[in-house]
């Protein structure tokens, strides 16, 4: 073998090694914002917000204008992870100690059984018992809070007492005082995504923004100085999240992960009007009410899917859709087994790829407390 042949052969082997190192299935990052109003992204109609990274996600993906979550956090998250309407998922109100029934199959379990590494970074809020926690529901790794909210720096829950600390790594309580929760989320995402590039990952980033307590960066408080409160505080927190989204996308590109990673973005429910968020701040436009309500402003949420390699870019879909649809949609896009899959959701792939297709839903079901 001469030198030229050796170089060509070696180069071919190296190239083959690089190709083989790429996961056969796409990575997935499912981003769930918290109490994010129906229209509180520029591309969804807000006129006073700066959200360049969420807007870029829509420019490079498909944006849904008639998309639904649930009136409150736990109900929304249970339906998201099971692909089932609230009553069937087993949660019709916010979770306390008891939460998502362990016998329900979650999207994380489906991903894991098909060879994915799985992580939940951020907020669980589907029960505080360890035997029904994230590690028991399909997540290889969990870093975040088990309850509904914490102070973003101390990671204590301050409301009505007792003041409980809530920060966990898997089933071990940890402490990270003084470190901003969402910033720590991003560090954990970066570590998990790069631990093993030979296997695909599924990361559920349940970020707790713009949920109270409203603790935005000074940069954005200054930017929105002319907005009246509570809109100013809320808007600054939304833009704080937008910065972290931009940092995530920059990281994915730098690591060579962007092309093969599906990004899904959605809010859990409408904006809060609770006293802890100064009775408002969010924007639902023509849609009545907000969080805790069955009216449109409580359940209609912004939603985007972005995978430029395979899906349309800069397109809008007005078809009826719901968070339960992400389960079958991601299973189809990732080429996973659908055997014994028990979901109420419908794959959005036909609608995503062809805007002329009709919604597969005739009726959506919502349950929350005594509202249904």
Task: Name these PLM-found stretches.
Residues 2-14, 20-372:
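Formylglycine-dependent sulfatase
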């Amino acid at each position: 073998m001469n030198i030229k042949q050796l170089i060509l052969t070696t180069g071919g082997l190296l190239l083959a090694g690089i190709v083989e190192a790429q996961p056969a299935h796409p990575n997935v990052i499912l981003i769930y914002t918290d109490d994010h109003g129906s229209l509180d992204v520029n591309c969804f109609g807000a006129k006073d917000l700066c959200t360049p990274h969420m807007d870029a996600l829509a420019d490079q993906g498909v944006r849904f204008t008639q998309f639904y979550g649930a009136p409150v956090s736990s109900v929304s998250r249970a339906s998201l992870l099971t692909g089932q309407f609230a009553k069937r998922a087993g949660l019709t109100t916010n979770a306390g100690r008891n939460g998502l029934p362990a016998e329900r199959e979650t999207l994380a379990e489906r991903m894991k059984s098909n060879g994915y590494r799985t992580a939940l970074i951020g907020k669980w809020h589907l029960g505080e018992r360890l035997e029904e926690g994230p590690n028991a529901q399909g997540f290889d790794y969990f870093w975040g809070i088990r309850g509904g909210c914490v102070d973003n720096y101390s990671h204590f829950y301050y409301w009505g007492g007792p003041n409980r600390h809530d920060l966990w790594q898997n089933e071990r309580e940890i402490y990270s005082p003084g470190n901003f929760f969402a910033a720590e989320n991003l560090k954990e995402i970066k570590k998990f995504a790069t631990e093993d590039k030979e296997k695909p990952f599924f990361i559920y980033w349940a970020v707790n923004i713009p949920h109270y307590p409203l603790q935005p960066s000074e940069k954005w408080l200054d930017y929105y100085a002319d907005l009246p409160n509570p809109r100013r505080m809320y808007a600054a927190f939304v833009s704080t999240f937008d910065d972290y989204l931009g940092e995530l996308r920059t990281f994915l590109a730098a690591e060579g992960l962007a092309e093969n990673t599906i990004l899904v973005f959605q809010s859990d429910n409408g904006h809060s009007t609770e006293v802890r968020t100064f009775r408002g701040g969010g924007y639902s436009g023509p849609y009545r009410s907000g969080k805790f309500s069955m009216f449109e402003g409580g359940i209609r949420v912004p939603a985007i899917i972005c995978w430029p390699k395979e899906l349309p870019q800069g397109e809008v879909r007005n078809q009826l859709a719901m968070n339960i649809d992400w389960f079958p949609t991601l299973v189809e896009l990732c080429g996973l087994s659908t055997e014994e899959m028990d979901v109420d959701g419908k794959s959005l792939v036909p609608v995503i790829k062809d805007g002329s297709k009709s919604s597969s839903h005739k009726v959506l079901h919502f349950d929350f407390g005594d509202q249904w």
